[in-house]
């Protein structure tokens, strides 16, 4: 039998709207995302995909509506009221976003291995050898040569940067 956390959405967006002056970025979006669920946002250019994803990730505060995160204890908290540090940890451990522009999702000034290891460190892994081995393993899984573990993302092609975000 699944526990209450698995039955509850991990992220709830209700009536999200973002206005840029008189221009509508997006309006009235509501959705729920459950643990283990993968969601893709598709649409025409200028339809509000990036605006929506930026609100869902906490990078952009909505003009109206809310984004609630349900933590492991079942407590719902406003994603936009969380500290930047907590939100960053959350996005590295429990929620994942593959950004249209990889520079929005990667730390370009540090190595690919460090980008991968950051999530593991947030989850409590501390041994350098374990972090490095995990980074090499993940690079192989997304079909990036593990010999490039020390290269910075800016040295990768756009497609490789997209895969590195995964």
Stretch-by-stretch model annotation:
Residues 75-96, 122:
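ABC ATPase NBD coupling module
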Residues 152-156, 160:
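Conserved ABC ATPase signature
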Residues 130-147:
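Conserved ABC ATPase "signature" region
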Residues 65-78:
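Conserved ABC transporter NBD signature motif
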Residues 57:
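Helix-to-loop junction immediately C-terminal to a conserved catalytic motif
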Residues 42-44:
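The feature captures the beta-strand-to-loop junction immediately N-terminal to the Walker
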Residues 101, 108-122:
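Q-loop/switch helix immediately C-terminal to the Walker
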């Amino acid at each position: 039998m699944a526990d209450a956390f698995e039955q509850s959405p991990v992220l709830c967006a209700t009536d999200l709207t973002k206005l840029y002056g008189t221009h509508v970025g997006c309006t009235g979006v509501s959705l729920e995302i459950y643990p283990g669920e993968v969601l893709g946002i598709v649409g025409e250019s200028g339809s509000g995909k990036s605006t929506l994803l930026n609100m869902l990730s906490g990078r952009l505060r909505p003009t109206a509506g809310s984004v609630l995160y349900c933590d492991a204890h079942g407590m719902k908290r406003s994603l936009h009221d969380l500290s930047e540090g907590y939100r960053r940890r959350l996005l590295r451990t429990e929620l994942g976003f593959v950004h249209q522009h990889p520079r929005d999702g990667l730390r370009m000034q540090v190595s690919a291995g460090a980008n991968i290891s950051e999530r593991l460190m947030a989850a409590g892994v501390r041994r350098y050898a374990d972090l490095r081995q995990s980074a090499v393993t993940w690079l192989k899984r997304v079909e990036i040569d593990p010999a490039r573990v020390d290269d910075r993302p800016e040295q990768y092609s756009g497609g490789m940067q997209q895969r590195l975000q995964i």
